[in-house]
Curated annotation (Swiss-Prot):
Species: Fowlpox virus (strain NVSL) (FPV)
Protein name as catalogued: Probable deoxycytidine kinase FPV151
Positions with a binding annotation for substrate: E53, Y68, Q79, R105, D110, E172
GO molecular function, one term: deoxycytidine kinase activity
Keyword ATP-binding carried by entry: yes
Amino acid sequence: MAFQELCCSNLLKFENCSLLETHKKISIEGNISAGKSTLINILSDNGYNVVQEPLEQWRGNNLLDKLYKDPSRWAYTFQSHAFWTRTKTYIDALNKNKGNIILERSVFSDKYIFATALHDIGYIDDTEWNIYNEYSKWMTEFMDIKIDGIIYLKTSPDICYKRMLNRARHEENTVKIDYLNLLHDKHEKWLSENNEHEFKVPVLEINGDGDFIDDSNRQSSILSNIYDFISELYI
């Protein structure tokens, strides 16, 4: 579907969509291999409406693989595509679900974490960065994309790196620990240091270093904290 068609077809839905006012949108943020997908699956098993990253769309065009193999060529293209597909995923989720929605990352981490990091490194040049900022800001405002809270799965870069190697996605073969350190610093600046950007939302920080797959007590504690966090968003 073309961009104009997506905007027009969803604008009328947004005008009467009570989800935007009565239900909460929460994103799970964290580094590569922080444990987000695992947490998303646990939440899904416990009855939450969850929305996973559109990873297969990125793989379908081989963009994720191209990004890691030749970032100076593909960084801007990938981040533009990621922002677009995540926007569509967000809109589809609002139209399909009648309750709180938990997203695996958001358009905001696309911008404040990944696109910013790639610009800092120099893989996205200043011209591309200005274009990215202009259209991402416009699209976010036009589509009224909002999140009401963030669950920050804070996992140390060393642990993330070990998990990344263990899961052995071929696209990530060239990812170095230095890049994970940079992404960790970006998350800390965004989520742990007073959320300095243009929107401020409550943040629940969860330590992602430990085991919450086989440790049932820890899993129960995390689920309880998330339940309380979402409940407090309504107060």
